[in-house]
Amino acid sequence: MLSADIKTVNISPDEIKKYDQIVDIRTPSEWQETGIITGAKTITFDPSDKSAFLDELSKAVDIKKPIALVCRSGRRSTAAAAAIDNSVLKIINLDGGMSSLIEQGYKTTPYKK
């Protein structure tokens, strides 16, 4: 079985532009509160139900291409990256999360259900 290449990068407005596939793993209330990265897929990561997360992920993105994960601060995306280690070939953990990105002036897109 192949193991994923997991890379952690500091999140910044410029860094965001590098990724075609971004998955925001926060909760709907968090998406509603702050907005999301333009073009990001929204899939909540629940550590108690990793298989459901993987199912949703494989439907939303091409798991053979790099996937950038973002949460509020970087902790959940680290856990999610570890959970999907064998399912995706390249994972980028956006460290600092949405909190850091917003502090740096990134203008989010309002979340719509």
Where are these regions (language model features)?
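Structural scaffold elements adjacent to functional motifs in cytosolic proteins
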Residues: 22-24
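Short, surface-exposed ligand- or partner-binding patches at beta-edge/loop junctions that are enriched
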Residues: 70
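Rhodanese-like catalytic fold shared by cysteine-dependent sulfurtransferases
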Residues: 1-15, 28-66, 75-113
